[in-house]
């Protein structure tokens, strides 16, 4: 079948095209492969051996070096570098593989689920088929990923095409504490074809590493975008005001009910408490405790609250946070240094200052 082509294409068609196999090979001859090492000079007895310059001596092969990687078998391309661009990630290089260590950036999100969701979205966006997926084992194996490139175009017949087919496996290992996980990628299968004929390619460890790094960088780059979106959303959420209600039960001490998740309330209190005149001397987020100290500062309160000072004695106090009855509620108790509840009247008066600052919207920093 005769193809319609433009004159520009005719000019391009006669230009030599290098195949992916040739791109990894050095240009020029390979006579050096057959080169023989010249013997050392034989010095007659009685004469001194002249000094030799060892600057250009070729070092001996190491125990892990492959002696077959010479000539056309030697890949001259520079190595690829792993780019841990996503927030909370870094690289750990082992003897057999390269892994990305991913740290949690949001305690309210399951890290393993976040990684799997990002990988699923990445595969869908890149139209990469999946052969198997096992969340419990932390493994995703792709089906064949094909890349085609036309190397020779014919006017009267079919084009000669180069085809690269690969399959990868992503392993996700989460630490028992759930705050750190590892992502390791393996090249499971690799095939190369030219004009329908399979090419015999000897992949070295560096070749496999090159392909896996390229795929790993693409996946991490996608995760970087998603994590940045999450960080921006969380920062915006932190700027929003939090409504706080005063709860005075018939029995028991009065407390405050903040209409937000525990982490959001905890972070907001770190800003609000100093503005109320409290000094944070210590804190324990796992136990939900703020150890605070109050010092009466009339000048501060006069300017901020129109001479309406907190009805608190100077001294040390504790602020206790607990999860509420719903995920969007956090309960807050104000207690003295001996962990005893304060009177409902004091809690009620402090509430006026606390609620006003908590519901105030902040500028995004």
From Swiss-Prot:
InterPro entries: BamC, BamC_C, NlpB/DapX. A lipid is attached at residue 17 (S-diacylglycerol cysteine). GO terms for cellular component: cell outer membrane. The keyword Zinc does not apply. Belongs to the BamC family. Part of the outer membrane protein assembly complex, which is involved in assembly and insertion of beta-barrel proteins into the outer membrane. Part of the Bam complex. This is Outer membrane protein assembly factor BamC. It comes from Shewanella oneidensis (strain ATCC 700550 / JCM 31522 / CIP 106686 / LMG 19005 / NCIMB 14063 / MR-1). The gene is bamC.
């Amino acid at each position: 079948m005769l193809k319609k082509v433009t004159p520009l294409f005719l000019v391009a068609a006669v230009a030599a095209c290098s195949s992916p196999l040739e791109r990894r090979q050095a240009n020029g001859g390979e006579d050096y492969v057959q080169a023989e090492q010249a013997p050392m000079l034989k010095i007659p007895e009685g004469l001194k051996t002249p000094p030799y310059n060892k600057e250009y001596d070729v070092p001996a092969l190491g125990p892990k070096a492959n002696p077959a990687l010479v000539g056309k078998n030697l890949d001259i391309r520079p190595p690829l570098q792993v780019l841990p661009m996503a927030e909370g990630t870094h690289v750990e290089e082992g003897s057999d593989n390269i892994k990305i260590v991913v740290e949690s950036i949001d305690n309210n999100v399951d890290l393993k689920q976040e990684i799997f969701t990002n990988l699923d979205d990445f595969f869908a966006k890149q139209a990469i088929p999946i052969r198997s997926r096992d969340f419990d084992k932390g493994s995703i194996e792709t089906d064949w990923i094909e890349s085609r490139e036309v190397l020779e175009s014919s006017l009267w017949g079919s084009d000669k095409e180069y085809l690269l087919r690969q399959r990868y496996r992503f392993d996700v290992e989460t630490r028992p504490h759930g705050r750190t996980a590892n992502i390791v990628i393996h090249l499971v299968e690799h095939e190369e074809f030219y004009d329908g004929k399979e090419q015999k390619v000897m992949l070295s460890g560096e070749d496999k590493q090159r392909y896996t790094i390229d795929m790993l960088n693409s996946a991490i780059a996608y995760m970087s975008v998603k994590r940045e979106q999450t960080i921006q959303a969380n920062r915006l959420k932190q700027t929003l005001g939090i409504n706080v209600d005063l709860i005075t039960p018939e029995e028991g001490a009065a407390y405050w009910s903040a209409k937000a998740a525990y982490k959001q309330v905890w972070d907001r209190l770190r800003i609000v408490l100093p503005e109320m005149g409290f000094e944070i001397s210590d804190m324990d987020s796992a136990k939900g405790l703020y150890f605070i100290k109050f010092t009466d500062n009339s000048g501060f309160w006069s300017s901020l609250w129109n001479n309406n000072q907190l009805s608190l004695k100077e001294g040390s106090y504790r602020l206790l946070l607990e999860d509420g009855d719903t995920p969007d509620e956090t309960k807050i108790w104000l207690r003295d240094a001996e962990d005893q509840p304060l009177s409902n009247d004091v809690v009620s008066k402090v509430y006026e200052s606390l609620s006003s600052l908590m519901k105030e919207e902040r500028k995004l920093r």
